[in-house]
Design a protein with these regions (language model features):
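Basic, amphipathic "hinge/linker" alpha-helix immediately C-terminal to the N-terminal HTH DNA-binding motif
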Residues: 5-9
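A short, surface-exposed loop/turn module that caps and links secondary-structure elements
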Residues: 27-52
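Short hydrophobic/aromatic-rich motifs at helix boundaries and adjacent loops
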Residues: 1-3, 29-30
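Enriched for short, Lys/Arg-rich terminal
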Residues: 2-3, 14-15, 20-23, 53-57, ...
């Protein structure tokens, strides 16, 4: 599967880089979505799926072989 990041998700990732360990965990979780787009702990929220990674939530959309990272939020 192919993973792309929205502009908002990219900007948020950069903004949260003060927490490098947290963003590395987010990046690993996002890369793992290519192998398993519905991992244990991912919740469906409307047209999107939400994955919790430590204090962060990753909102993403699966469309065929394309995964779009829509947004990253801090809890």
């Amino acid at each position: 599967m192919r993973i792309i990041w929205s502009e908002i998700a990219q900007a948020t990732f950069v903004r949260f880089m003060a927490d490098q360990a947290g963003m590395m965990a987010v990046n690993r979780a996002v890369e793992a979505l290519a192998d398993d787009p519905a991992p244990l702990g991912a919740f469906v929220r409307g047209a999107y799926r939400r994955l919790r990674v430590g204090p962060y939530r990753v909102l993403y959309e699966v469309d065929g072989n394309l995964i779009t990272i829509v947004r990253i939020d801090r809890i």
